[in-house]
Amino acid sequence: MSGSTGERSFADIITSIRYWVIHSITIPSLFIAGWLFVSTGLAYDVFGSPRPNEYFTESRQGIPLITDRFDSLEQLDEFSRSF
């Protein structure tokens, strides 16, 4: 049988009032912060991904697909020039 590490048991933690006071504030706060991060568009700016209306522009309607493995760098340069 192993010795005690002196830590509180999981059942003791989740049945304490202090646990629920702390987590009843932090869990909804994290949810609201995440929702605001995405809904304001800040997530698109931080990670550099295009917004849903920016995937296809008027000048670029095709899918950037590389078709020739030996000319892939030239095709990538061509795709990047269209941005």
UniProtKB/Swiss-Prot annotation:
The chain crosses the membrane at residues 21-35. The keyword Thylakoid applies. It is a single-pass membrane protein. With its partner (PsbF) binds heme. PSII binds additional chlorophylls, carotenoids and specific lipids. GO terms for cellular component: chloroplast thylakoid membrane; photosystem II reaction center. Its main location: plastid. Keywords: Chloroplast, Electron transport, Heme, Iron, Membrane, Metal-binding, Photosynthesis, Photosystem II, Plastid, Thylakoid, Transmembrane, Transmembrane helix, Transport. NCBIfam families: cyt_b559_alpha. This b-type cytochrome is tightly associated with the reaction center of photosystem II (PSII). PSII is a light-driven water:plastoquinone oxidoreductase that uses light energy to abstract electrons from H(2)O, generating O(2) and a proton gradient subsequently used for ATP formation. It consists of a core antenna complex that captures photons, and an electron transfer chain that converts photonic excitation into a charge separation. HAMAP family: PSII_PsbE (MF_00642). This is Cytochrome b559 subunit alpha.
